[in-house]
């Protein structure tokens, strides 16, 4: 089967998942014909992605979140205002995505949480079936419980997640925790996509802490802690 990837370029998680998925598909005799990655002025592809992915990589301009001045979370107001001014650019990107889906010879599209994939399937109705992959699709599972947070923000998060997977035949929710599939929501819970290098690593004792921060602004909090 010929597969086309569309990947949200914000952060590292979706890029890593795409690398692992390509390895998995190739081992099982399938072909990844192209990888389309969303980009913005603040994003550049990390070296590990360019070194690891084998299929041709192409870029398109896509929405991104602007941080607060403290760079600890996304600023909703700034992000909405900025992306509204760039709607004509994103429309061109949707035209491009649709053209690549139809011209690449792909028999399946795998979407890694890219908003413009959902918008392309909403407005252009590509003929190629789509599957959406990401841990965020667990938010749509009937049994998933959010921690106590602002209800409006959670509603927006679920709305954004639903927009990314418009047109998807199935949503693969990546999770370390085993859960039953939510057939009504077309959500299948599957293990996370981890790179082989991660599985082969061995921990060592030392005077250090190892962690991952989504926004660099949290570094100050860690230092104080």
Regions found by a protein language model. Give the residues of each.
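Active-site-proximal region of nucleotide-activated glycan assembly enzymes
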Residues: 127-189
């Amino acid at each position: 089967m010929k597969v086309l990837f569309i990947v949200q370029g914000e952060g590292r998680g979706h890029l890593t998942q795409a690398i692992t998925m390509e390895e998995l598909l190739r081992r099982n005799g399938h072909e990844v014909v192209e990888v389309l990655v969303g980009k913005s002025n603040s994003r550049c592809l990390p070296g590990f992605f360019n070194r690891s992915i084998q299929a041709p990589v192409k870029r398109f301009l896509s929405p991104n979140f602007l941080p607060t001045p403290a760079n600890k979370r996304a600023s909703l107001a700034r992000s909405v205002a900025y992306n509204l001014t760039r709607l004509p650019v994103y429309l061109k990107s949707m035209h491009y995505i649709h053209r690549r889906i139809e011209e690449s010879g792909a028999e399946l599209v795998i979407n890694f949480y890219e908003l413009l994939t959902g918008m392309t399937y909403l407005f252009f109705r590509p003929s190629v079936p789509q599957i959406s992959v990401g841990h965020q699709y667990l938010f749509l599972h009937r049994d998933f419980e959010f921690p106590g947070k602002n209800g409006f923000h959670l509603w927006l998060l679920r709305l954004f997640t639903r927009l990314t997977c418009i047109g998807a035949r199935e949503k693969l929710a990546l999770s370390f925790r085993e859960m039953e599939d939510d057939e009504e929501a077309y959500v299948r819970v599957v293990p996370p996509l981890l790179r082989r290098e991660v599985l082969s690593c061995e921990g060592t004792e030392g005077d250090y802490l190892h962690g991952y921060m989504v926004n660099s602004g949290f570094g100050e909090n860690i230092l104080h802690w």
